[in-house]
Amino acid sequence: MMEMLAPENMVRVLFSSGGSDAVEGALKISRQYWKLMGKAEKTKFFSLKHAYHGVHFGGMSVSGGIPWRRAYEPLLPGCFQIDSPFLYRNAYTEDAEELGAICAANLAREIEHQGPDTVAAFIAEPIQGAGGVIVPPANFWPLIREVCDKYDVLLIADEVITGFGRTGSMFGSRYWGVKPDIMCFAKGINSGYIPLGATVINQRVVDAWEKDDPLAPLMHGYTYSGHPLACAAAMANLNIVESEDLPGNAGTVGAYFLERLGELTQFPTVGDVRGVGLMIAVELVKDKITKEPFAPHDPYIMEIQKICRNEGAFIRIQGNKLILSPPLIFTKNHVDQAIEIMLIAFEQSKFD
């Protein structure tokens, strides 16, 4: 795995049991890093609205979706969210490049407002998954890297979904041409066969632990961290991902899937089709002009899901969105079958 991450200059890994664990490790390492660097006041975290970073208190605190947080508040203090670069739904512009610049500038402005000497890290998913497969403009991540460098803030990429091929690139941050300081993995690391997560850090961060400091011991770990069975499954899985070029397949088949999904725009309720690789969403609206969303669990959306399931296509519902995240071995033939089923579902579902 570390050989795969050599271009990002990642040199150490902390194993855990899943994505939430991996994020928690990243947040703790970030705070400890700045204490070791003699900047103990750098404790705050920035993230994006619509973000999802797991179910631990740290991860929930940097998540940007209210439903994931509300029942457990108050959460960790010192966590702030900025507007997501959501092209279909934002208050700024319909121009992608302009939106990316605006959102990056928002981060810079908020860091200045809080004080750069108090901010530890910015954490984000290269493509926001559970929030609705929000694909940022191409300039967003490079600009975020510049902002983090300018204000001496660590950049954490939550690659729990995007890691190991789903975007068409081996890693989501690599897809955008950006090198984070810390990366979080799970899911694709061993295709979920055995629970495993990983937090990996680059040389810059590792160097802080070379100091003879009473705060240097990393007080973090889980009962099953680095479990041999989980790691063996990961090795076998990653060998297949790499040798069979599953990232390449995800990119090729994903592009074809998006093209075919364009056929759904003939229906009055399909407001947006978006995605990268095999990470796709179809957003449903009551009106294409106003973009009024369907309420969660609306009978119309549930009927579409039911028909698809009965016909053999399992589709996740997230609010008013159909989430499509098939295996990386998906083929164009599979896409054609899925589209045929979805067309049937939309034709048969009643919308008043």
Regions found by a protein language model. Give the residues of each.
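Conserved N-terminal phosphate-binding loop of PLP-dependent enzymes in the Aspartate aminotransferase
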Residues: 1-352
